[in-house]
């Protein structure tokens, strides 16, 4: 369990990804231009890219209830075909999931537990992009230059409503409405 200062300001959320069988270079290059990594702007976003062996890697879908879909491969395959209907015949060969930590405002939570104890969590699915920056800011602060780190420390991170027992059901209901 987390220390009281930060407990309740993050919540675990399941997120999932699937990989298709190799699609072949020509077919794969027709899906995503310049082999870009892509994410949409939906609140619960989809993200995708091609692997080195021309598989479609497609992620997204979340579980706020801490229950995984019964069949992750089928769930992610359906989401993928919604975005790429031309992949309806592509077989999903790998699928997996895990937890990320989200914050109420979906911004990473950086701060100090004491003068020399720093933390960074709650990257809300943006960890690949932002953890390197957070590590650099913490390193600067440890070395005595904390101005940039302190900018993030001033962001107001509210606790999830409902306390430890009701926050997950409350979020599930809110997302069902959304």
Please report, for each region that a protein language model flagged, where it lies by residue.
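C-terminal lid/capping helical subdomain adjacent to the catalytic/cofactor pocket in oxidative enzymes
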Residues: 115-119, 123-178
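Active-site substrate-recognition segment that forms the wall
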Residues: 1-115
């Amino acid at each position: 369990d987390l220390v009281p200062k930060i407990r309740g300001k993050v919540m675990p959320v399941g997120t999932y990804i699937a990989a298709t069988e190799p699609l072949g270079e020509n077919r794969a290059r027709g899906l995503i231009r310049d082999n870009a990594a892509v994410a949409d702007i939906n609140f619960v976003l989809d993200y995708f890219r091609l692997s080195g062996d021309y598989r479609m890697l497609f992620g997204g879908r979340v579980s706020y209830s801490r229950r995984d879909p019964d069949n992750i491969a089928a769930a992610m395959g359906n989401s993928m075909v919604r975005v790429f209907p031309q992949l309806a015949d592509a077989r999903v060969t790998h699928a997996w999931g895990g937890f990320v930590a989200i914050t109420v405002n979906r911004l990473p939570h950086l701060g100090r537990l004491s003068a020399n104890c720093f933390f960074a969590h709650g990257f809300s699915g943006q960890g690949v992009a932002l953890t390197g920056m957070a590590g650099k800011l913490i390193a600067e602060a440890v070395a005595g230059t904390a101005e940039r780190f302190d900018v993030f420390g001033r962001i107001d991170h509210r606790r999830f409503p409902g306390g430890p027992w009701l926050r997950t059901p409350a979020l599930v209901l809110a997302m069902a409405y959304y």
